[in-house]
Design a protein with these regions (language model features):
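Compact beta-sheet-dominated domain cores in extracellular/mature segments
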Residues: 17-19, 24-27, 43, 49-60, ...
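Acidic/polar N-terminal loop/beta-strand segments that form early-domain functional surfaces
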Residues: 40
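Fungal secretory targeting signals
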Residues: 1-19
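Short, ordered beta-strand-loop transition motifs
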Residues: 28-34, 78-85
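Cationic, beta-structured binding surfaces that engage anionic biopolymers and membranes
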Residues: 65-73, 87
């Protein structure tokens, strides 16, 4: 389980009272497989935060269930949220190929002093500090990548990211090296470019929202990228 920002230690007893989110939080929605809500902190203000459901849920032959890195979005569609109940059409092994399934997200997701957090791997004993980066209204970000030269007008590869990832590269069976990139629509990701496909090199460049619509020329060729949310996120 990952949580953004610096963690602040709290005693488990102080967090035990969290019961859910649907009755006390507002502006609850599902955006690109992220659960987003604005929740009271208990101190008179509120925090907008998110949980990446694709890393929390799985489809088991047409039934939604809890699973770390379950990637339910690969085989479920037409998902809707009613209160805390997520309903989807998910693939099954026999005909018809999809069936309706629902899951109560409050089984493992609750408001902890303003933050939506999942407790499916254990009791919550720490919560993150509040990020200054707003939760995006659109989680998709695009990198148009050039493989030769330094002109972003000649990009030949388009990489779309909307999932947190420690390391990602386009695997076509041959090594692809990028010389420049044009980023668009980054509303809060930290995207780090690396010289190798394992993302073990020193960072070559770190993209933020400030780099939108600007051509970035790498000082050495790049092969892979990591993507980390900078907003309030449990992923």
């Amino acid at each position: 389980m990952h949580r953004s920002s610096v963690l602040l230690g709290l005693c488990s007893a102080a967090l035990a009272a969290a019961q859910g989110f649907s009755t006390e939080c507002s502006d609850i929605s599902i955006i690109d497989y992220w659960l987003v809500a604005t929740c009271p902190t208990g101190s008179g203000d509120s925090i907008t935060s998110s949980v990446f459901l694709n890393a929390k849920l799985a489809n088991s032959n047409g039934n939604l269930g809890w699973a770390e890195d379950g990637y339910y979005a690969r085989s479920c569609q037409d998902c809707t949220l009613d209160g805390a109940t997520l309903s989807c059409e998910c693939e099954i092994a026999s005909l018809p190929s999809y069936q309706s399934t629902s899951l109560n997200l409050e089984e493992h997701i609750a408001n902890y002093e303003g933050h939506l957090l999942s407790n499916q791997t254990g009791a919550i004993t720490t919560i993150p500090s509040d990020s200054t980066v707003a939760v995006p209204s659109d989680f998709d970000v695009t990198l148009a990548l050039a493989t030769t030269g330094t002109a972003c007008e000649r990009t030949g590869v388009s990489l779309g990211l909307n999932n947190p990832t420690d390391c990602y590269y386009i695997n076509l069976g041959v090594t692809i090296e990028y010389t420049a990139a044009l980023q668009t629509d980054n509303q809060g990701w930290e995207i780090v470019a690396y010289a190798d496909t394992e993302c073990t090199s020193d960072p070559i460049y770190t993209f933020s929202s400030d780099d939108n619509d600007s051509c970035v020329v790498f000082n050495e060729t790049v092969q892979a990228f990591s993507a980390t949310p900078l907003w309030n996120a449990d992923y």
